[in-house]
A protein has these predicted regions:
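Clamp-loader machinery-focused feature within the broader ASCE/P-loop NTPase space
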Residues: 1-144
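Charged, glycine-rich active-site and insertion segments that engage polyanionic ligands
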Residues: 1-57, 65, 121, 158-161, ...
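Short, structurally constrained coil/turn elements
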Residues: 80-82, 156, 176
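Catalytic acidic motif of RecA-like/P-loop NTPases
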Residues: 136-142, 147-154, 170
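Structural recognition of the conserved hydrophobic beta-strand(s) that form the central parallel beta-sheet
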Residues: 132-136, 149, 160-166
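Residue-level recognition of specific faces of alpha-helices
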Residues: 71-74, 85, 119, 137, ...
């Protein structure tokens, strides 16, 4: 069943964004906004919606309370994507080479940032208010682009607001981060997220989907709409077949390029559940509780140290997704490790696991 009632700008702030929204709008009303905000948080928390709604409010000529009016000339132009004082910088499409139609470039270019700076510096506000720029995903600015933006962050034009949106603030240069005021979104309490999800569609599997998505409600909505349940069960069955020698890891690793983020996330949730079973037993809060018999069997004969080391490798593969030239090979290596029962990882060095998690 397709999920309906996806959030829009009219729904902002979402329940878990209300405190941040109140703080931002109060500073806007008091004319105490910094020149640049770094809005961060994991995927699926509505960062871009929040930033876009705030940009619209900052440009609105007749705000109603802490919301944009939606009917003034500024709001009408914003909705139409024609507001002369609003710039959105995002990944551009590739240049149409064979097999690349519709695909996005891997980085925000220095040319895009230079064009933005030119717009901010060389022209005054067309409507007599402020100028707003939204850069997303900010962590994908090239080094040259980030360096080009730095001068503007150090000496911002008057009446200009820069909104940098990112799911990975650590990938931005420290010099850029230090010149922005941080606005960090956190995942809501599970009860809050489930109430919000069930208000849009009643589903018994929301707890599983929410856990799979690291507690991010919009990500849970997204995966629910893609029919992930059948793919999840099929993938876990394939992992069981790998352990029993009934499947070939090289063949199982062959997928379309855009499938690997989901597959790695599934593998991460599978292994993290095995760690919970090994360390806390079957009453632990498992993401994939509906697959408990399969998980219990998978946990047999594998020690906790090996599972932690394997989780480190999965996390490294996740973090390398944007730069990995051969996702299939990297995924094949992970599946081969699993097929051998993680034997080579028994004495592997471990990263710190005081706060490991999906990012």
């Amino acid at each position: 069943m397709e999920v309906s009632n996806l959030p829009t700008l009219q729904d902002i702030p979402l329940p878990w964004q209300q405190d941040i929204w109140r703080s931002l709008t109060a500073r806007l009303a008091a004319a105490k906004l910094p020149h640049a905000l770094l809005i961060s948080g994991e995927a699926g928390l509505g960062k871009t919606l929040l930033a876009t709604a705030f940009a619209r409010l900052a440009l609105c000529r007749s705000p109603v309370g802490d919301k944009a009016c939606g009917s003034c000339t500024s709001c009408s132009q914003f909705a139409a994507g024609t507001h002369a004082d609003f710039n959105r910088i995002e990944l551009e499409e590739r240049d149409g080479k064979a097999g690349e139609d519709g695909q996005l470039k891997s980085a925000i270019s220095v040319e895009q940032i230079r064009d933005l700076i030119g717009s901010l510096l060389l022209s005054s506000s067309r409507q007599g208010g402020r100028k707003v720029a939204l850069i997303e995903p900010a962590e994908l600015m090239s080094i040259s682009a980030a360096n080009s933006l730095l001068k503007t962050l150090e000496e911002p034009p008057a009446d200009t607001l820069l909104l940098l949106v990112t799911a990975a603030p650590g990938r931005l240069p420290a010099t850029v981060r230090s010149r922005c005021q941080s606005v960090a979104l956190a995942a809501p309490a599970t009860a809050v997220a489930l109430d919000w999800l069930n208000a849009r569609q009643r589903r018994e599997d929301w707890p599983t989907l929410l856990g799979f998505c690291g507690g991010a409600p919009l990500a849970a909505l997204d995966v629910a709409a893609t029919g992930i349940e059948e793919r999840r069960k099929a993938f876990f069955t394939a992992l069981a077949r790998l352990r029993s020698g009934e499947a070939n890891p090289v063949l199982l690793a062959v997928h379309p390029k855009d499938a690997y983020p989901e597959l790695l996330k599934l593998l991460w949730s599978f292994v993290s559940d095995l760690i919970l079973i090994q360390s806390a037993g079957t009453r632990a809060p498992l993401v994939n509780r509906d697959q408990l018999p399969l998980l219990q069997k998978a946990a047999e004969g594998i020690n906790l140290r090996s599972l932690y080391a394997y989780l480190d490798r999965i996390q490294a593969a996740i973090q390398a997704l944007d730069t990995s030239a051969n996702r299939e090979l990297a995924f094949s290596v992970l599946l081969s490790d699993w097929a051998t029962g993680l034997e080579e990882l028994n004495n592997a060095p471990l990263a710190a696991h005081t706060a490991w998690g999906w990012t």
